[in-house]
Amino acid sequence: MILLLVLALGLAGASPLGEYKECPPHSRPWQVNLHDGKMSCSGALIDRWWIVTSFDCALTAHRTIATLGDHDLTVEEGTEQHIPVAEVIVHSPYRSPLHSLTMVRLAQPAQFNQHVQPVPLASRCPQPGEICSVSGWGSTRPNHFEPQQRLKCITVPVVDDQTCVNTFPQYLYWSQHMVCAGRADTDNCMSNRGSVMVCGGQLQGVQWFNHGCKDPAHPSVYSKMCLYNDWIHQVMARHPPFETTTVSTTTRGRKD
């Protein structure tokens, strides 16, 4: 009941279409900040041991900390859980043209409370026109790459595949494992790896590619999470957590 209430409140607090706003504090309890002292990116907590993020966020395990329950990156609010990363599993091959996804295993389990909750995996695929919420700490201004201090949110419509293909960069390949969201006056141009897209209370996208704030008329591309449930469960089964564990970085392909 607590999780459902938090999810409902979180999506209800999303910004009006086309406008970036600060998320209501702690309204996205699944949002994770991954950082290694040099760079940071977003991810989604899906289990007390596991985070899913983009390939671009495949940081080195032994140097990376996952911060859960955060809102303002510059202030310790007392809600944060800072947990070392134990293992990083990259879905390969990357952009070949199939996948851009990484799973991160925590060295210690997350402690669920009102500020830290997992987001449910997708039980269906998103539909064109469906309105979703995207959140992340990335910059929303051109040529500014420093992370925002506070978590930002925007609501975006899912775009049909053909419209997305028509705006897709020639140097990337279109794949059925992608989903696009955004339009000319509402796009996710956050320069934040692993920004999270939630539709109807379910994890439907992790940012794969966007055109940046210089070109917001084109939709952003996300990994289509509804097609990755089998892979996610395979990774979790093959890499069982331990209360005390060594750290490593691993690359694994999908078992077909």
UniProtKB/Swiss-Prot annotation:
GO molecular function: serine-type endopeptidase activity
Family: Belongs to the peptidase S1 family.
Annotated source species: Pseudopleuronectes americanus
Sorted UniProt keywords: Disulfide bond, Serine protease homolog, Signal
Any Pfam family hit: Trypsin
One GO CC term on file: secretory granule
Disulfide feature: C23-C153, C41-C57, C125-C226, C132-C199, C164-C180, C189-C213
SMART domains the record matches: Tryp_SPc
InterPro entries documented for this protein: Peptidase_S1_PA, Peptidase_S1_PA_chymotrypsin, Trypsin_dom
Any one of the GO BP annotations: proteolysis
Keyword Ribosomal protein: no
Signal sequence region: 1-14
SUPFAM superfamilies given in the database record: Trypsin-like serine proteases
Coiled-coil residue windows: none
Protein name: Trypsinogen-like protein 3
Domain Peptidase S1: 15-237
